[in-house]
């Protein structure tokens, strides 16, 4: 993950939505519609690059399996929601 790509990805989402989605990967919280739409607008490549970066950290590595699954499910749910808004 190049630092330029990473920086561009992080700028594509508000800090509130970034926090909401981060917490979702570890806990049963709801991701609101606004954040879902921001996620899809950010793009799949950015989302999964950022998620992979989180779970490559020793601090979060133990939660990688469930977190990666939750992030994939979230992406799919948000993509469906975004299609409904097109």
Predicted regions, residues:
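Mature extracellular/luminal domains of secreted and GPI-anchored eukaryotic proteins, especially small
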Residues: 1-86
């Amino acid at each position: 993950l190049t630092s330029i790509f990473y920086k561009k990805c992080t700028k594509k989402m508000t800090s509130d939505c970034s926090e909401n989605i981060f917490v979702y990967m570890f806990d049963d919280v709801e991701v609101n519609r606004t954040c879902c739409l921001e996620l899809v607008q950010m793009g799949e490549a950015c989302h999964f690059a950022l998620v992979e970066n989180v779970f490559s950290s020793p601090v979060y590595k133990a939660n990688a399996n469930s977190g990666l699954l939750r992030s994939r499910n979230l992406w799919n749910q948000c993509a469906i929601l975004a299609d409904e808004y097109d």
